[in-house]
Design a protein with these regions (language model features):
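Histidine-acidic metal/acid-base catalytic patches
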Residues: 5-16, 21-31, 39-53, 119-120, ...
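Active-site acidic/histidine proton-transfer and metal-coordination neighborhood
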Residues: 5-12, 94, 98-196, 206
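N-terminal substrate-binding region of glycoside hydrolase catalytic domains
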Residues: 48-66, 74, 86-91
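Glycine-rich, proline-tolerant flexible connector loops at the mouths of alpha/beta enzymes
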Residues: 58-76, 127-138
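Short amphipathic alpha-helices and their capping/turn segments at secondary-structure boundaries
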Residues: 66-78, 107-119, 147-155, 210-217, ...
Length: 290
C-alpha cells in the first residue's frame, strides 16, 4: 500500500470527505403556495410573484380538476410554472376502513390527472396523520402494502406525466413516516419512477439534520422541498437566528437539485414586509451555502 493509501486508511474523516457528493451547478427556484403572497386574486398573486422573481406556484389539490383551465390561462406568458400540488385528497392510503381507502383512491387519482394537465412536478401525500384512524399498524406487512399501493399510484402518475411525492412529517404529526431516508427507501421499494419524496425544513428540524436528510433522498427521489421559520412555522426570518437553512441548501447544491423550494408557512406580521424579506433571506443563505 502506498503512502497516500495508508494516509487515507488512517483517517476515516478523510475517507468520508472523499466520498461526499460534489456540488453541481444549480439555482434556487422558489415557489409560493397560493396563500403566501399578500394579494387577493390569482392574477394579483402572480404579478406579485413575478416582481420578486418567484418561479413556482404550489396550489392545493382540493377541486384542482375544476381549476385546470383557470391556472392554464393565468400562467400563459408568465415565467411561473406549477410546482407540486399540496395534497387535497379525501381519506388516506393506510385506512383500515375500505370506504375511507376508496375515497382516497378516487380523489387522489383525480388530483394526479389534473396535476399532469398542469405540468406539475407531483402530488404531495402523507400516508397517515396521527389523528387519522382506524389506521393500519406500524409493521413490515403494512410497509409492504404501502409499497404495493405506491407502485400503483406511481405508475398511474407516470401515465399522466407527473409523480406522487411522499412527505415525511415530525413525530407530533405522524407516527408512520418521519425520516426523509425512510421515504426514499419506500420510493426505491415501490419500484416505480413515479414515486418520489420530499423534505420539509419544519419537520426535519425535529427528526434529523437538514444536510443528512436531503442527501439521503438523493437526486433520484428528491422531488420537492418545503420551507418555513424554524420556531413557529411562520415566514423564514420571523424566528431570527433559528432560521438557518445553509446546511440544507448546501445539500441541495451538492445534489444539483433542480426542483422547487416552496413556502409552506403562516405569517405573524405584515406580509408586505415579511414576504420579500423571507425571499431575500433564502437567496442570501443560498449564496452562503458553499
Amino acid at each position: 500500500m502506498g503512502t497516500a493509501g495508508a494516509a487515507m486508511m488512517s483517517s476515516p474523516l478523510a475517507m468520508f470527505t472523499s466520498c461526499a457528493p460534489k456540488e453541481k451547478p444549480c439555482e434556487l427556484r422558489i415557489s409560493f403556495q397560493e396563500g403566501t403572497a399578500p394579494c387577493k386574486t390569482l392574477e394579483e398573486k402572480l404579478d406579485y410573484m413575478e416582481e420578486l422573481g418567484i418561479v413556482g406556484l404550489e396550489p392545493k389539490g382540493k377541486n384542482l380538476a375544476e381549476r385546470v383551465n383557470e391556472f392554464q390561462q393565468a400562467l400563459r406568458g408568465r415565467n411561473i410554472r406549477i410546482s407540486a400540488i399540496c395534497a387535497g385528497f379525501s381519506g388516506f392510503i393506510l385506512a383500515e376502513d375500505p370506504s375511507v381507502k376508496a375515497d382516497f383512491d378516487s380523489s387522489m387519482r383525480d388530483i394526479i390527472a389534473a396535476a399532469g394537465e398542469l405540468g406539475s412536478t407531483g402530488v404531495i401525500m402523507v400516508p397517515a396523520f396521527n389523528h387519522q384512524s382506524p389506521c393500519m399498524p406500524h409493521t413490515l406487512e403494512t410497509r409492504k402494502y404501502l409499497c404495493e399501493q405506491m407502485h400503483e399510484l406511481g405508475e398511474y402518475a407516470l401515465k399522466h406525466n407527473t409523480t406522487v411525492i411522499l412527505e415525511p412529517l415530525n413525530r407530533k404529526e405522524a407516527h408512520y413516516l418521519r425520516q426523509v431516508a425512510d421515504a426514499a427507501a419506500i420510493c426505491r421499494d415501490s419500484e416505480s419512477a413515479g414515486v418520489k419524496c420530499m423534505g420539509d425544513f419544519w419537520h426535519m428540524k425535529e427528526e434529523t439534520s437538514d444536510y443528512a436528510a436531503l442527501l439521503s433522498a438523493g437526486t433520484e427521489y428528491l422531488q420537492h422541498v418545503h420551507i418555513a421559520s424554524r420556531g413557529t412555522r411562520k415566514m423564514p426570518g420571523e424566528d431570527g437566528e433559528l432560521d438557518n437553512y445553509v446546511d440544507g441548501f448546501r445539500a441541495l447544491k451538492q445534489l444539483g437539485y433542480d426542483k422547487y423550494v416552496s413556502f409552506e408557512c403562516g405569517c405573524n406580521g405584515d406580509k408586505e414586509i415579511l414576504v420579500p424579506a423571507a425571499v431575500q433571506l433564502m437567496r442570501t443563505q443560498w449564496e452562503q451555502a458553499l
